[in-house]
C-alpha cells in the first residue's frame, strides 16, 4: 500500500495573514491592494481582509474577471461540482492532446451560452493577451493565404490596424497595439503598425461633430490601407476601450470599419476580454453594435481565455482552425478553470444574469446621473452599457484622490485613462449594493473638491 505523503510546514513561523505581504515581498514586487483576501469569509460583492476582518464593497471584481462575485452559493453549495473541481485540480492534462468529459461539457456549455453560430471555431489558451495574440496569428495566416490565392506575395499580411488609447495586453504582438501608459510598453521592442484616432463619444459633441471625428479616423484608416497595399491583415478594437478610459463608440464607426476591412480584404477582430460574458448586458458587446466580426478574443469572466472565429476566416479553407498545430499550447486552457467556467455559465444562464445586467446597469447609470446633477463641476460624463459604467473627474489628481477616499470608506473601484473611475461589479450585484457604492462616492466628493 502506498504511503500517504502529507503536506509538511517548513521550519519557521507559519504564514499567517499578517505575514503575507512580508513573505511575498522577499521574492516579488508587492504593489497590489493593501488587503489580504480571506477566501473563506469573502462573499458576493464583498471582499474580507483576513488581517482586519474589514469588509470591502467590491466594484472591481479582480479587474472585471469575477462574474458571480466571491463564493457564490450556487457553487459553494454544489457538492457534485466540488467533486468535479477537485478531480480536475488533482491533475493538469494537456487539453490540446488528451480530451476529457470535463472539457467536452465546458465547450458544449460555452457554445450554448456564449457562442455565435457565425463564429463556430473555438481556441482556448491561458491569458487574455494570448487570446488576442492568437487572434492576430489567425489573421496573419489568413491574409498571407488569401494573398497567395490571388497572386499576391504571401510574405505580405504582417500589419495590424488599431486605435489610439487601446489596451490589448502585454505579450509580444500585443505590446505593439497597447498604448495606454508608457510604463507598460516603454523599452520593449515593438512593431511599427498603423495606429488611428479613436473617435469615441464625449460630452459636448453633437452629431455633426461626432461624424467629423469618425470621418477623420476613417480617412486615416483608408490611408493606412492604401499606403500598405495587401499588408494589413486585420483591424482590432475593443468595442468599449476599458483601460483607455471607458471610451464608447457609435455603431456607425465600426460599421464603416467593417466595410473598409471588406474592401481591403482584412479581418475585423473585436477584443472582448473585458467587455464580454454579459458585463454590457449581452453575451458580447458587439451584439449591441450591429457589426459582425470575423474573430472575437475573450477572457476574464470566461475564466478560460481564447478566440471565436468564422465568417471571412472560412473563405480560406486551410485556415489555422483547419490545419493542425498552427495554433496550439500545452494546456489549451486549464481544465480546472473549464470546470469552474462551465458551472458559472450554467448559473448565468439559469438566473438570467445577462438580463439582470441590463436592468441593474440602468439603475447604476441612473444613480451616476444623479451624482452628476448634484456635483456638475466634478462628476463628468457618466456613461455605461449594462454594468460597465464609469464617470470622469476634472483632473487625474481628483480621480486618484476619490479612489483613495473610497478605499478609506471600504469601497474598491478602478481607475481608467487619465481621469476616469470605472465600476466593474459582478453580474449578481444588488441595487442595495449599488446604493452603498453611490453613497460612498457622494460622501467622498466634498473631500475631493
Swiss-Prot record:
Single Gene Ontology MF annotation: pyridoxal phosphate binding
E.C. number: 2.6.1.36
SUPFAM superfamilies on file: PLP-dependent transferases
Pfam families cross-referenced by the UniProt entry: Aminotran_3
Top-level lineage group: Bacteria
Record InterPro entries: Aminotrans_3, Aminotrans_3_PPA_site, L-lysine_6-transaminase, PyrdxlP-dep_Trfase, PyrdxlP-dep_Trfase_major, PyrdxlP-dep_Trfase_small
Binding site for L-lysine: 170
The reaction(s) this protein catalyses: L-lysine + 2-oxoglutarate = (S)-2-amino-6-oxohexanoate + L-glutamate
Binding-site list for pyridoxal 5'-phosphate: 128-129, 274
Keywords: Aminotransferase, Pyridoxal phosphate, Transferase
Induction: 42-fold induced by starvation. Expression is regulated by the HTH-type transcriptional regulator LrpA.
Gene Ontology biological process terms from the UniProt entry: antibiotic biosynthetic process; gamma-aminobutyric acid catabolic process
The protein's required cofactors: pyridoxal 5'-phosphate
Principal EC category: transferase
Residues bound to 2-oxoglutarate: 170, 274, 422
Domain comment quoted from the record: Contains a Glu-243 'switch' that allows the enzyme to change substrate preferences in the two half-reactions. The unique substrate L-lysine is recognized specifically when Glu-243 maintains a salt bridge with Arg-422. On the other hand, the binding of the common C5 substrates L-glutamate and alpha-ketoglutarate is enabled when Glu-243 switches away and unshields Arg-422.
Family per record: Belongs to the class-III pyridoxal-phosphate-dependent aminotransferase family.
Note: Was identified as a high-confidence drug target. Various compounds targeting the LAT enzyme have been identified as potential anti-tuberculosis agents.
The protein's role, per its UniProt record: Catalyzes the transfer of the terminal amino group of L-lysine to alpha-ketoglutarate to yield L-glutamate and 2-aminoadipate 6-semialdehyde ((S)-2-amino-6-oxohexanoate), which is spontaneously converted to the dehydrated form 1-piperideine 6-carboxylate. Probably plays a role in persistence.
Subunit structure and binding partners: Homodimer.
Protein name as catalogued: L-lysine-epsilon aminotransferase
Organism: Mycobacterium tuberculosis (strain ATCC 25618 / H37Rv)
Amino acid at each position: 500500500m502506498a504511503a500517504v505523503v502529507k503536506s509538511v510546514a517548513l521550519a519557521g513561523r507559519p504564514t499567517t495573514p499578517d505575514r503575507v505581504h512580508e513573505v511575498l515581498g522577499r521574492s516579488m514586487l508587492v504593489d497590489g491592494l493593501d488587503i489580504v483576501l480571506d477566501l473563506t469569509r469573502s462573499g458576493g460583492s464583498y471582499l474580507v481582509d483576513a488581517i482586519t476582518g474589514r469588509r470591502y464593497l467590491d466594484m472591481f471584481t479582480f479587474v472585471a474577471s469575477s462574474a458571480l462575485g466571491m463564493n457564490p452559493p450556487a457553487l459553494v453549495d454544489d457538492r457534485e461540482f466540488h467533486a468535479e473541481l477537485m478531480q480536475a485540480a488533482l491533475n493538469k492534462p494537456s487539453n490540446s492532446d488528451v480530451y476529457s468529459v470535463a472539457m467536452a461539457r465546458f465547450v458544449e456549455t460555452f457554445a450554448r451560452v456564449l457562442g455565435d453560430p457565425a463564429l463556430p471555431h473555438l481556441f482556448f489558451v491561458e491569458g487574455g493577451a494570448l487570446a488576442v495574440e492568437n487572434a492576430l496569428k489567425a489573421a496573419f495566416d489568413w491574409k498571407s493565404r488569401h494573398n497567395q490565392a490571388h497572386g499576391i506575395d504571401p510574405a505580405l499580411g504582417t500589419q495590424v490596424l488599431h486605435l489610439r488609447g487601446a489596451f490589448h495586453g502585454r505579450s509580444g504582438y500585443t505590446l505593439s497595439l497597447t498604448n495606454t501608459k508608457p510604463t507598460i510598453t516603454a523599452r520593449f521592442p515593438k512593431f511599427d503598425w498603423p495606429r488611428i484616432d479613436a473617435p469615441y463619444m464625449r460630452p459636448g459633441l453633437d452629431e455633426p461633430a461626432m461624424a467629423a471625428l469618425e470621418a477623420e479616423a476613417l480617412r486615416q484608416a483608408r490611408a493606412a490601407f492604401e499606403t500598405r497595399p495587401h499588408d494589413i491583415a486585420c483591424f482590432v478594437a475593443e468595442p468599449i476601450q476599458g483601460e483607455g478610459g471607458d471610451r464608447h463608440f457609435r455603431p456607425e464607426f465600426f460599421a464603416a470599419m467593417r466595410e473598409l476591412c471588406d474592401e481591403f480584404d482584412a479581418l475585423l477582430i473585436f477584443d472582448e476580454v473585458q467587455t464580454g460574458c454579459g458585463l454590457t448586458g449581452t453575451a458580447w458587446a458587439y451584439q449591441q453594435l450591429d457589426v459582425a466580426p470575423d474573430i472575437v478574443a475573450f477572457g476574464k469572466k470566461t475564466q478560460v481565455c481564447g478566440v471565436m472565429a468564422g465568417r471571412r476566416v472560412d473563405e480560406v479553407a486551410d485556415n489555422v482552425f483547419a490545419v493542425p498545430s498552427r495554433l496550439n499550447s500545452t494546456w489549451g486552457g486549464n481544465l480546472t478553470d473549464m470546470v469552474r467556467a462551465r458551472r458559472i455559465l450554467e448559473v448565468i444562464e439559469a438566473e438570467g444574469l445577462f438580463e439582470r445586467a441590463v436592468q441593474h446597469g440602468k439603475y447604476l447609470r441612473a444613480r451616476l446621473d444623479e451624482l452628476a446633477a448634484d456635483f456638475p463641476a466634478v462628476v463628468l460624463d457618466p456613461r455605461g452599457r449594462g454594468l460597465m459604467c464609469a464617470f470622469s473627474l476634472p483632473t487625474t489628481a481628483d480621480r486618484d484622490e476619490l479612489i483613495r477616499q473610497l478605499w478609506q470608506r471600504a469601497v474598491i473601484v478602478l481607475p481608467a485613462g487619465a481621469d476616469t473611475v470605472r465600476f466593474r461589479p459582478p453580474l449578481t450585484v444588488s441595487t442595495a449594493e449599488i446604493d452603498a457604492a453611490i453613497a460612498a462616492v457622494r460622501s467622498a466628493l466634498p473631500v475631493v473638491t
